[in-house]
UniProtKB/Swiss-Prot annotation:
Disulphide-bridged cysteine pairs: 7-15, 39-47
Similarity section: Belongs to the protamine P1 family.
PROSITE patterns: PROTAMINE_P1 (PS00048)
Main location: nucleus
Organism this protein belongs to: Sus scrofa
Protein name, as recorded: Sperm protamine P1
Task performed by this protein: Protamines substitute for histones in the chromatin of sperm during the haploid phase of spermatogenesis. They compact sperm DNA into a highly condensed, stable and inactive complex.
Transmembrane segments: none
GO CC, any one term: nucleus
Amino acid sequence: MARYRCCRSHSRSRCRPRRRRCRRRRRRCCPRRRRAVCCRRYTVIRCRRC
């Protein structure tokens, strides 16, 4: 699948696909150490820092 980048909105970190707006459901950004992880259902996709 495509890569996602993290974006902050309303004091919360969220993942959004490139060239598209942030989505509220299905995708979440979980900060881990120095990197962020994009989680979609049971799949995990790595993304840039938040």
